[in-house]
């Protein structure tokens, strides 16, 4: 039919996505149904197909008009309620009611349990006084191939049935009710679409049969003469035939049969709830419900075409202000978030999904052992940076699966070895911390790296390579022995009573690869996302976050450690926000990532608001310290929105009603945040066990004791230390065999020492610095494989403890 009456006004206004705050997400628990949907404000927002990182629809909603006095769309003009169709399934009943009582729209929303079709069973209830006077329309905004531009819309006829069809490249969408349309139209958004048509005079006057190459919308009036109860279907395919056939195959099955199959599929996952069901006395009904929801959400965020791939969130934060030039959203893989989710499923007794995740990560790993900061589920990078904690997390997951005897026939040895080598070769500073905005020495990154290295060493030793295992443990010891030196200020100013506390990150100063200064009291941190004209540089020792709590989580530091407790006093004074639900914390002071202070969207700068995730992290620490955590659990549960979804951020300022910002309630950032749901699952498991689930016993056994360990310093090309303390073991590393040509007496007695190899492709030479050594260590490299000398000499000064104390005293006096 298309082409006879094309819509005017192309290509339409600039397309946008919808906001990141979702009330629910849903999908079938079957790999054959490769479609995911989201809900917000009573309507379907982004719909994903055929993979979980590909949103294809902006929104799908009903509109109502009497053709004379009013026109409504569900999102703007109704009062909405939402509930689950079944406690254990991600399908929903949504009721949208006219505030004036003229009508209500009841919707049951699921996906076909076996096909790529969204199904919305609809009852249009009309008040007696308005019977026969109201018209019902459906409006769909396709954003095919992850974009609003270059979409095409047309009306298709098949066997006497008309349906709406949208297409772009090889992706096709078909939309129709189980009854029939009485009118159909295709148009350009903002010019000739159905919403614009109805808003003009409350009538559907336009019936255009096509709108090509633009930001388009599909509109159809439901034929209510056939009844006010029907099922609306929206199907996808690789051609119009495939999409249309899928649509009508789904619609020909009684809706209740599809619901029964949909629910039965999700009930197969109930074994993952046993850890809570068997401990009902320890877990409240509310906690049990959110635990169940969290498990299902974690399972739902795994892709079905790429098994094991788990994204961070089915949302696009502040999507209402994002167009085609910002494709990523949070529907991407971050290894950090993914491993958190897989670990939570392990805590729930699921080993199958975490193993799939491990195998997926093994394939996604770069050849050099690193992982991209985030990536599409096919492995293509979105942001190409590398964060060391994201390299470390897969090692920890592999270790947990190994300890749980859950690796089946999969051998993660190469994945673990390559990641381990990357951490040692490219560390010890990270290009970005877990907040993805600053590089240097981060307590949270160091904690993850230390834990991962100890896990890797255990696995290496189990395979018979004790030599490499000991090498890895020694590097972990080096990191552990420097944590406080690198990330603790002795000149704290944020809380007058606490001078010594952990900081967020120490942005070390280097010059041509040489470390100029690793002192956290001398660094200056540049903050991202700051408002133009505002200050953006601060002394590093004035910026704090919660990252140091990861040291306790993994067993590197003891709960109750005085330095940990003092640091908590600082973050409570600087970052804590007491809300009606309970305490919550900001990421760090002067954070600019969040809803702007006037309530509008984050756009390159804003205000960092509290994160419920951090309430859960604090609860994990308090549990480890043996203290009551009820207040934190109740707070987190109070922050949940919709059907129990944790928001990334809650509004931390006074209410701004016209922007829908209310103190302690969700902002327009991501909902749900799967990292937070994973933390909640692990917290409840930890509470039941009275032991932190994430704690790694070999790590705690090594570091949470008073046993002395050798003092180690590491020199490598990307960390050319300038000084070493007498009595220290200096280990010199390189990624290739070398002969170290060196002297400790100003070249009077030069020596040659061949490097010792490891299975990681990293070689080393150890120099035990004599306690009485005074002359600097001087050295250069001969590279036998390349038959060349380095062409540069290096020096490491030797200092003595008394000398160091004196120098520090002089420096302090000078600063005073």
Locations of the language-model features?
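Aromatic-rich carbohydrate-recognition surfaces in CAZymes
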Residues: 126-128, 151-154, 168, 224, ...
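Extended ligand-binding clefts on enzyme/binding-domain cores
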Residues: 148, 161-195, 281, 286-290, ...
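An extended acidic
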Residues: 4-96, 174-195, 272-284, 735
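Long, well-ordered core segments of solenoidal/helical folds
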Residues: 297-306, 349-372, 411-432, 474-494, ...
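Extended, loop-rich substrate-binding clefts of extracytoplasmic carbohydrate-active enzymes
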Residues: 69-114, 191-216, 429
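C-terminal capping/lid segments that line or modulate ligand- or cofactor-binding pockets
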Residues: 2-54, 330-333, 341, 384-404, ...
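Acidic/polar, glycine-enriched structural segments that form the non-catalytic walls/loops
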Residues: 1-9, 101, 112-119, 123-329, ...
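Glycan-association/targeting regions that enable binding to alpha-glucans and other polysaccharides
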Residues: 695-816
């Amino acid at each position: 039919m298309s082409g006879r009456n094309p819509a005017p006004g192309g290509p339409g206004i600039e397309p946008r996505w919808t906001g990141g705050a979702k009330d629910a997400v849903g999908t079938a628990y079957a790999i054959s149904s490769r479609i995911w949907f989201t809900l917000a404000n009573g309507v379907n927002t982004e719909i994903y197909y055929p993979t979980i990182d590909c949103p294809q629809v902006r929104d799908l909603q009903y509109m109502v008009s009497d053709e004379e006095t009013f026109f409504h769309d569900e999102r703007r003009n109704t009062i909405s309620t939402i509930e689950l169709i079944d406690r254990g399934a991600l399908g929903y009943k949504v009721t949208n009611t006219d505030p004036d009582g003229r009508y209500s729209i009841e919707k049951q929303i699921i996906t076909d349990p076996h096909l790529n079709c969204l199904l919305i069973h609809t009852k249009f209830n009309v008040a007696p006084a308005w019977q026969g006077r109201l018209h019902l329309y459906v409006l769909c905004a396709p954003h095919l191939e992850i974009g609003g531009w270059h979409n095409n819309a047309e009306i298709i006829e098949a066997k006497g049935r008309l349906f709406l069809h949208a297409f772009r490249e090889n992706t096709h969408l078909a939309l129709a009710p189980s009854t029939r349309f009485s009118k159909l139209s295709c148009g350009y958004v903002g010019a000739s679409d159905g919403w614009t048509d109805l808003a003009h005079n409350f009538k559907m006057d336009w019936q255009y049969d096509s709108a090509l190459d633009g930001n388009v919308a599909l509109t159809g009036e439901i034929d209510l003469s056939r009844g006010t109860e029907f099922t609306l279907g929206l199907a996808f395919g690789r051609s119009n035939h495939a999409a249309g056939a899928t649509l009508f195959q789904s619609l020909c099955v009684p809706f209740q049969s599809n619901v029964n199959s949909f629910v039965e599929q999700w009930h197969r996952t109930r074994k993952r709830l046993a850890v809570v069901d068997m401990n009902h006395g320890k877990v409240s009904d509310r906690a049990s419900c959110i635990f169940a929801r969290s498990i299902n959400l974690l399972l739902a965020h795994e892709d079905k075409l790429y098994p094991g791939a788990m994204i961070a969130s089915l949302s696009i934060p502040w999507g209402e202000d994002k167009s085609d030039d910002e494709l990523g959203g949070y529907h991407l893989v971050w290894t950090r978030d993914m491993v958190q989710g897989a670990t939570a499923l392990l805590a729930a007794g699921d080993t199958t999904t975490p193993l799939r995740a491990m195998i997926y990560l093994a394939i996604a790993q770069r050849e050099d052992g690193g992982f991209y900061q985030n990536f599409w589920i096919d492995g293509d990078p979105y942001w190409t940076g590398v964060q060391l904690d994201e390299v470390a997390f897969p090692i920890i997951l592999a270790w947990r699966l190994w300890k749980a005897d859950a690796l089946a026939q999969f051998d993660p040895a190469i994945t673990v070895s390559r990641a381990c080598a990357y951490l040692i070769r490219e560390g010890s500073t990270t290009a970005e911390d877990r907040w993805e905005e600053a590089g240097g020495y981060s307590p949270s990154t160091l904690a993850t790296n230390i834990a991962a290295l100890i896990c890797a060493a255990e696995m290496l030793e189990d395979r018979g390579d004790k030599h490499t295992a000991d090498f890895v443990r020694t590097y972990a010891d080096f990191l552990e022995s420097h944590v406080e030196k690198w990330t603790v200020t002795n000149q704290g100013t944020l809380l007058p009573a606490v001078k010594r506390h952990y900081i967020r990150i120490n942005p070390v100063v280097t010059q041509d690869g040489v470390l100029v200064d690793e002192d956290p009291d001398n660094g200056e941190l540049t903050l991202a996302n700051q408002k133009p004209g505002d200050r953006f540089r601060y002394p590093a020792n004035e910026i704090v976050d919660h990252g140091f709590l990861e040291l306790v989580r993994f067993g590197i530091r003891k709960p109750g450690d005085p330095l940990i407790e003092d640091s908590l006093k600082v973050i409570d004074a600087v970052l804590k926000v007491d809300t009606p639900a309970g305490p919550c914390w900001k990421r760090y002071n002067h954070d600019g990532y969040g809803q702007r202070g006037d309530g509008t969207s984050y756009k390159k700068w804003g205000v960092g608001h509290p994160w419920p995730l951090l309430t859960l992290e604090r609860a994990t620490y308090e549990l480890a310290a043996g203290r009551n955590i009820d207040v934190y659990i109740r707070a987190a549960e109070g922050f949940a929105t919709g059907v129990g979804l944790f928001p990334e951020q809650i509004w931390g300022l006074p209410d701004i009603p016209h922007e829908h910002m209310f103190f302690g309630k969700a902002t327009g950032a991501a909902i749900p945040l799967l990292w937070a749901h994973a933390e909640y699952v692990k917290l409840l498991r930890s509470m039941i066990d009275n032991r932190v689930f994430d704690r790694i016993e070999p790590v705690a056994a090594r570091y949470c004791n008073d046993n002395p360990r050798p003092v180690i310093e590491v020199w490598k090309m990307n960390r050319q230390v300038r000084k070493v303390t007498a009595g220290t073991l200096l280990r010199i590393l390189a990624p290739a065999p070398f002969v170290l040509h060196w002297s400790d007496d100003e070249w009077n007695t030069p020596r040659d020492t061949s490097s010792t190899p490891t299975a990681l492709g990293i070689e080393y030479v150890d120099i035990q610095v004599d306690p009485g050594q005074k002359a600097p260590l001087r050295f250069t490299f001969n590279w036998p494989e390349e038959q060349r000398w380095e062409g540069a000499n290096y020096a490491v000064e030797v200092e003595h403890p008394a000398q160091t104390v004196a120098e520090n005293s002089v420096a302090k006096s000078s600063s005073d």
